[in-house]
Design a protein with these regions (language model features):
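Bacterial N-terminal signal peptides that target proteins for export
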Residues: 1-9
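Bimodal "functional hotspot" detector
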Residues: 7, 14, 21-552
Length: 552
């Protein structure tokens, strides 16, 4: 099964914060400062409150000190009244911004800071980015304690600049099951890098998945209302003590709970194995078997022959190769392990099996189809973004309900390897967009709809989007190929995470992922296949293809 994740590493750093704008005690709105820590190796060192500081200084000091995670934000708590210092929860949320905030003093004891948030992290560690900044007011009420101003009331959470966030927080996935209990599905969470603990990760896991993959898209083995009492780690083994209430889990349930916990905690604090304890009693459950790794070799159509490319070696494919080639494929998805392919041809969308080939969608203007793990083929016309169809291996056709507001055309679609999510690349009047939505199914596994809630994927507005693909076997990251005036850029983004460029290409038209970032491939318009090596794309002149297929 499972373990195909790579946590983002926080940078080691040392920075003394300084140069903050004064906050007025009355009058009109003023603009605060932002600070840039790009390309600096820094540790944030906050200052405690000084004697005689005014309310405005206390608010400014608190906002600054909240970047210091040491000792559970001890310095930040010094700016609060004793009562609030005991209850203030810095983990309630993170407001992330890259533009100055605005400050309004309502009175001597009341101040409101309005943060133009570009993203937020909620109490469960779920990151949500925004296409445009959203104003988030943060109110402060102050009172005197022993003659010194302190904050008596303010919501939980902290405010961070974008660059601070990347240094102070680290990401790791919590794992849930697909509806068939066959694979675990990653759900990225963000935690303070200095304060991340196994207990915090388990609490986030028990809180449930993010909205795009909430049930019925995924499911969890933990009974509703389950809480965690403790997580003890010894010799690489984490013992997770759970309270499942009145429901005593079965051995099957405990086995699945262990799988979710093991995937979510792997390598944190040296954890290599997990024991599940319910009410203080250790439950001895077996380990679920690993999921088979997907193919690594590129599958291509080359001079009328379908085959695999490994290095510069081309080997004709003997399972479905001839049947696929006979359709005149222009793109699509192939599952050699299942003996099944869905390809776009001059006739429309054709499904290829060892025994037959048939056209399942002949509508005009169709884009490349995608294939899920249950054998459903999805198709949609480029210019009709709300007309999705799915057809199963027996030819049963269903309409898939989607909500594509503002979308003018569909560029690419690709189902995740576990069949729980759909990657969509599309055009709008404002520019290209990409997102990942959950696939909602009935109890028989028939796809019914894509979720209206989704993960946003970054695509620069000034580019022409060309293709998108899943990067890794776990389905934790996606990549987008987009063209600007100087060439083609490939951006990789963890779902619920931050985007990063992985190098530039020239004249690319297809992007295909496999098991990890190093297996990402692109086809150029001259037929060359480019492979990623570090942050550089390399091509072998002897390796060329007319079509580069997605594999499942």
């Amino acid at each position: 099964m499972r373990r195909w994740w790579a946590a983002l590493l926080a940078a080691a750093c040392v920075l003394v914060l300084a140069g903050c704008a004064d906050i007025p005690t009355s009058g009109d709105v003023k603009v605060g400062q932002t600070q840039d820590v790009k390309n600096q190796d820094v540790v944030l060192v906050p200052y405690p409150p000084a004697q005689g500081e005014a309310p405005a200084d206390i608010v400014q000091g608190f906002l600054t000190a909240a970047t210091g995670q040491q000792h559970s934000y001890r310095v930040a708590r010094d700016f609060l009244t004793p009562a609030l210092a005991k209850t203030w929860n810095p983990d309630a949320r993170v407001l992330i911004h890259d533009q100055p905030w605005q400050v309004k003093a309502v009175s001597e004891t009341s101040i409101v800071v309005t943060v133009p948030a570009t993203a937020e992290v909620n109490a469960e560690g779920v990151y949500t980015g925004y296409a445009a900044p959203r104003d988030r007011p943060v109110p402060f009420t102050l009172a005197k304690v022993n003659g010194q101003w302190r904050i008596a009331k303010t919501p939980g959470g902290i405010v961070l600049g974008t660059n601070y966030f990347g240094s102070l927080f680290t990401a790791r996935p919590a794992y849930y099951f697909d509806p068939r209990w066959s694979q675990t599905v990653p759900d990225l969470r963000w935690f303070p890098a200095r304060n991340i603990t196994p207990l915090r990760v388990v609490q986030a896991l028990l809180a449930g998945p993010a909205a795009p993959i909430a049930p019925p898209v995924t499911t969890s083995a933990f009974p509703h209302g389950t809480t965690v009492s403790s997580v003890q780690v010894a010799s690489g083994v984490a013992t997770v003590d759970l309270d499942t209430g009145s429901e005593l889990p079965s051995l099957t349930a405990v086995t699945r709970m262990r799988a979710q916990l093991e995937d979510s905690l792997l390598n944190l604090k040296g954890i290599q194995q997990v024991q599940v304890s319910v009410g203080g009693h250790v439950e001895h459950a077996p380990t679920l078997p690993p999921t088979a790794a997907p193919p690594l070799s590129a599958l291509v159509l080359r001079k009328g022959v379908v085959g695999t490319i490994a290095g510069s070696d081309f080997k004709p494919e003997r399972t479905l190769g001839r049947q696929i080639a006979a359709t005149g494929p222009q793109g699509g998805t192939v599952s050699l392990s299942r003996g099944f392919a869905a390809v776009r041809t001059p006739s429309g969308i054709e499904v290829v099996t060892a025994g037959a080939t048939r056209v399942v969608d002949s509508r005009p203007g169709l884009i490349d189809p995608t294939l899920d793990d249950r054998g459903w083929t999805y198709s949609v016309p480029q210019a009709d973004p709300n007309s999705w169809r799915a057809v199963d291996a027996r030819g049963h056709v269903v309409s898939v309900a989607v909500t594509m507001q503002d979308v003018t055309s569909i560029i690419a679609i690709e189902a995740s390897r576990d069949g729980t999510r759909m990657l969509v690349l599309a055009s709008t009047d404002r520019g290209p967009i990409a997102f990942v939505a959950g696939i909602v199914r009935d109890t028989s596994g028939v796809p019914l709809a894509l979720t209206s809630q989704h993960y946003d994927v970054d695509v620069p507005a000034s580019t022409t989007a060309l293709d998108a693909t899943w990067v890794d076997a776990a389905g934790s990251s996606v990549a987008v190929l987009a063209q600007d005036d100087t060439g083609d850029d490939v951006t990789v983004q963890q779902l619920g995470g931050l985007p990063s460029s992985v190098g530039r290409l020239s004249m690319a038209d297809t992007l295909v992922g496999a098991t990890s970032l190093k297996d990402l491939r692109a086809r150029l318009q001259n037929g060359s296949i480019a492979e990623l090596s570090g942050a550089v794309w390399s091509t072998d002149p002897s390796v060329a293809a007319d079509v580069l297929f997605v594999q499942r």
